[in-house]
Amino acid sequence: MMRFVTEGYHHVKKSNSRKYRYILALDPSGSFYEGKGTTGWCLFDTVKNKFINCGSLYAKDYDSMEAYWQAVIDLIKQNFLSNTIIVCEDYLLYANKLQNQINSRMETPKLIGCLQLFCYQYNLPYHMQTASEVKTRWANHILEHRGYIELINKRGEYRPTSGKCETYSHHSLDAIRHAIHYAIFKNN
């Protein structure tokens, strides 16, 4: 049986000191009843420094909250390659957003909990990062300057410069931020 250690929100093999070749980054929104959420994702190859695929899952495309959440888990199953770590945006209730969450059923933290449990049950390494950790550091102009994304129209919409892009949303762009941040600062 493998020994695992959970350090805060980081679940990896205790003896793991290798770099991951692939990063499957997720920007989940569990909101099914509260605004129809969108989960953005990307699969990044750290050796080639390129995206393999990215996209979005839309809650409105599913009949129930649980079916949507299962689709996110299925996405992990379909895109998890050998030597992959899952990097997921964590949910943190910021003081300036507190009033907006009154009477919320907190669907996004529930989805994130499902994803963490799935990773734990199947011994998939994962790491949680907050939005504030990556949004300022990886603003669009920085990602564009580094060649990860390109501006595609005058409305300020961006797309990755490599890989397939099945469906795309600003949540996909946030997943890109999480992948790049982990690849550069934490993948060691």
Q: What is each of the regions a protein language model found here?
A:
Residues 2-188:
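Phosphate- and other anionic-substrate recognition elements at nucleic-acid/protein interfaces
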